Amino acid sequence: MANKTEKPTPKKLKDAAKKGQSFKFKDLTTVVIILVGTFTIISFFSLSDVMLLYRYVIINDFEINEGKYFFAVVIVFFKIIGFPLFFCVLSAVLPTLVQTKFVLATKAIKIDFSVLNPVKGLKKIFSIKTIKEFFKSILLLIILALTTYFFWINDRKIIFSQVFSSVDGLYLIWGRLFKDIILFFLAFSILVIILDFVIEFILYMKDMMMDKQEIKREYIEQEGHFETKSRRRELHIEILSEQTKSDIRNSKLVVMNPTHIAIGIYFNPEIAPAPFISLIETNQCALAVRKYANEVGIPTVRDVKLARKLYKTHTKYSFVDFEHLDEVLRLIVWLEQVENTH
């Protein structure tokens, strides 16, 4: 870590995310689940459906159809538990996806036996993150004590009033008590959560730090070494035969795909009334054609659809067929108009 003084590049962070090493603040997900769970339970949970189910059983003197009863129990279960469970699952998934920018950790499923290394395990025990978690646990215990105290001071009258409440009133009282204790805890925890977030982010960025050699290596991988790129351009020219170079020089224009197909168009009304295909090249040769055409001043026009059509329907040194003649002539006329304006 002594030599890792450079901030991580976007590529480094993206590659780390694919390995499951993206920044994820787990406490944020926990807080969202608690809040969503609390308010959905208070909003959707009701004992009235349960009471109606029991009332139906008692009215029928416990002589009911087992299949219908099972179906009714399932419906009541999903009405009471289904909605809170759905929203809790959603609140667990969405914050994680947002934090990871919807990048799936495709490389994280690979087995890594290095995690079984006892030396690494020992280092984790005495790591900064472990110390941070220790102090965080102490703070949360203090917060729990404060929550209990203030909850008791604020809601003790309501707690004792349950003795005089009806069944429906009990549900409302429990809902309020549940909401109050959750909100008290989150209110006292907010500073700890923010501080924990900042420390977690700093530790994550520290783990992602790069040395200058890593940055240089990444740059070469992405951009390619200058000498390598120069040599590659030379090879593109070398793979063209003299005949192909001559065909390029004599062409009116070259229609490009732009990187996989190159179609040369020759047109001279004094020799032939219709344009014909002077060359057809693909892949590396197509790139070489574009490079050489630019060097000798032959226009290259990017038209993906036309290039694909001509490649599929024509051969080298064949006249453009009637079906594609209009498109090719329009392109030639447009090119002449552009040249005349300059």
From Swiss-Prot:
Keywords: Cell inner membrane, Cell membrane, Membrane, Plasmid, Transmembrane, Transmembrane helix, Virulence. The chain crosses the membrane at residues 28-48, 70-90, 133-153, 158-178, 181-201, 260-280. GO terms for cellular component: plasma membrane. It is found in: Cell inner membrane. Its main location: membrane. InterPro entries: BsaZ-like (IPR006307), T3SS_substrate_exporter (IPR006135), T3SS_substrate_exporter_C (IPR029025). GO terms for biological process: protein secretion. It comes from the Bacteria. NCBIfam families: FlhB_rel_III (TIGR01404), PRK08156.1 (NF006017). Belongs to the type III secretion exporter family. Required for surface presentation of invasion plasmid antigens. Could play a role in preserving the translocation competence of the ipa antigens. Required for invasion and for secretion of the three ipa proteins. This is Surface presentation of antigens protein SpaS.
